[in-house]
Amino acid sequence: AHPDDAEIGAGGLMAKYAAAGLRVGVVDLTQAEMSSNGTPEIRQAESERASSVLGLAVRVNLGLPDRTFARERLVRAIRELRPRVVLAPHWDDRHPDHVACSRITEEAVFSAKLRRYLPDVEPFEVGRLYFYFINGWAHPDIAVDVTDVYEIKRRALRCYESQFTPPGTDGRYVATPLNTGYLDFVETRDRSVGRLISAEYAEGFAAKGPVRVERL
């Protein structure tokens, strides 16, 4: 939904896959203009720095008005970028935008393969859709060891200075859930998921329905 969401939930996975030579990208739906701290311009610059740290091949911001999302724009982005795997925020989250983003992404992934929907653009079927955690975490269906790239995730998150800098006496930043211990929460969560698979750090992902594999 917003710049920094993907880094919070899947920064390690993105860094790991980018380092392995896979083409990794992010589509931000909004510029987060309703955020308490920072401006759209600051958030854009921060996301560009984070993308560089992670080694992303592409980052697109659809520029949808914050708190409103458009399925058609996302379907067009999916058909243009043709991703094999799509990640979206988990459907159970305290932030309504994350819930809306989860729903519209699921709808767009489904609609992108329909030849009679937006027939001016060639349809495309996404291989897999998984959901990452932002403000909480249930028991994940999949856990990916990101220990070897965790420092890259930390660096990428620190690029979002406007969101994670604690409020001071100068009034530059106001207190929000993101700048009052949030990064500690993220790291604790990733350690906890890592413990489930005997790793120092791991990121968890959820799936709706069985995950198809050829062999165990």
Predicted feature residues:
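Metal-dependent de-N-acetylase/amidase catalytic core
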Residues: F69-L216
